[in-house]
């Protein structure tokens, strides 16, 4: 299992009784004196002469940091609607598409909200989701799948030492129809919704449900994403990977450059609004920023909320996280989105600490 999730599993015992406070800070509207970043990001790059800032940036992108941070490929900071800092590690550049890994799960969170807004999914609490679920799995709700609480006996492992449903789904017999593979797993808990269990499989199941509901409306999944998200907010350098069954691999597979990942984060920072249009309702964004029940107050609608492993971040931060140290941080108190892409294959809480130090040089709004 990836070390980030090992840390989360260990901390969950502590979080039953203790969790750092999570601040809800109102998010600002876009500054209409600036163009929306649909085609181009406005740039207002800072010139920080602070030697401490230069020192930490130099360290972040140096070979000296490999043992603690891994390799940092990209760092992009958006504040007040403009790029204020951007740096890449060669040969990576601003046009390079990099894999999201589990940050893709947050895209499924967004798509679920868009489906509910349109009435294609009744609500988060809708059950009887798949025809093949005729046993107690019929009691699994959309909310359970959003918040890793289905009760399915899906084993999230990233090595070959024992059973790994994740590897079998991604690279084994399940790879052609990943959601159906995950949906075939039996229940471990008789009653869904009682326990948080991190699962890439659950996210792919939810993606299949989205596909099926779109088919009921005679809509193609890829076209729906393009027409209602990508073309609206300018995701010109983003690829959504689909498996052979036509289901978006929402558990792990978005490829994008840092600027497009920042657009996704900026949509959330602006309460789902983009250049006069509502991409997803503000109520969905608000719901995402509140911890879901039975998630140890650290997860909601496929986003992470502050917890001990991220305690150095501002307390209102909510974020996407992926294997290898991929992050999209959304920080309303600083009117900021931070994208960090890298290759970190050790405990990546050091990456969070590093980002926290960098963020501290930028003013609170």
What does each model-identified segment do?
Residues 8-17:
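Bacterial N-terminal signal peptides
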Residues 16-93, 117-121, 147, 179, ...:
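N-terminal leader/targeting segments and the immediately adjacent pre-domain N-terminus
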Residues 23, 320-365:
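Structured C-terminal helix/loop/strand segments within mature extracytoplasmic catalytic/sensor domains
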Residues 81, 98-123, 145, 206-210, ...:
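Active-site SXXK
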Residues 99, 117-157, 184-187, 215-252:
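Active-site helix/loop module of the DD-peptidase/beta-lactamase fold
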Residues 202-210, 252-273, 326-342:
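Active-site-proximal alpha-helical segments within enzyme catalytic domains
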Residues 224-289:
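Active-site-proximal binding-pocket segments
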Residues 235-238, 242, 289-337:
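Active-site Gly/Thr loop motif
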């Amino acid at each position: 299992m990836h070390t980030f999730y090992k840390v989360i599993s260990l901390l969950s015992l502590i979080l039953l009784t203790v969790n750092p406070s999570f601040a809800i800070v109102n998010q600002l509207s876009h500054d209409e004196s600036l163009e929306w970043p649909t085609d181009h990001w406005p740039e207002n790059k800072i010139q920080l002469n602070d030697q401490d800032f230069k020192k930490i940036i130099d360290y972040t992108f140096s070979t000296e940091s490999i043992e603690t941070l891994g390799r940092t490929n990209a760092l992009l900071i958006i504040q007040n609607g403009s790029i204020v800092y951007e740096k890449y590690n060669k040969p990576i550049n601003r046009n390079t598409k990099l894999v999201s890994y589990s940050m893709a799960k947050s895209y499924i969170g967004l798509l679920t909200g868009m489906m509910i807004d349109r009435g294609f999914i009744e609500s988060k609490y809708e059950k009887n989701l798949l025809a093949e679920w005729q046993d107690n799995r019929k009691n699994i709700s959309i909310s359970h799948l959003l918040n890793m609480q289905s009760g399915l006996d899906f084993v999230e492992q990233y090595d070959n030492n024992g059973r790994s449903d994740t590897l079998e789904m991604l690279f084994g017999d399940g790879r052609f129809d990943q959601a159906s593979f995950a949906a075939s797993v039996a229940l471990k808990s008789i009653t869904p919704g009682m326990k948080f269990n991190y699962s890439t499989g659950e996210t792919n199941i939810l993606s299949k449900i989205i596909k099926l509901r779109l088919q009921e409306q005679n809509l193609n999944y890829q076209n729906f994403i393009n027409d209602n998200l990508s073309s609206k907010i300018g995701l010109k350098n983003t690829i959504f990977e689909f498996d052979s069954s036509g289901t978006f691999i929402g558990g792990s597979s978005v490829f994008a450059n840092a600027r497009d990942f920042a657009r996704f984060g900026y949509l959330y920072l602006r309460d789902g609004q983009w250049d006069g249009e509502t991409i997803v309702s503000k109520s969905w964004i608000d719901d995402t920023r509140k911890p879901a029940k039975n998630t140890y107050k650290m997860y909601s609608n496929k986003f992470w909320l502050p917890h001990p492993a991220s305690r150095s971040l501002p307390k209102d931060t909510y974020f996407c996280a992926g294997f290898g140290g991929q992050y999209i941080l959304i920080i309303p108190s600083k009117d900021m989105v931070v994208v960090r892409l890298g290759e970190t294959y050790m405990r990546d809480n050091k990456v969070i600490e590093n980002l926290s130090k960098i963020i501290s040089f930028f003013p609170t709004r």
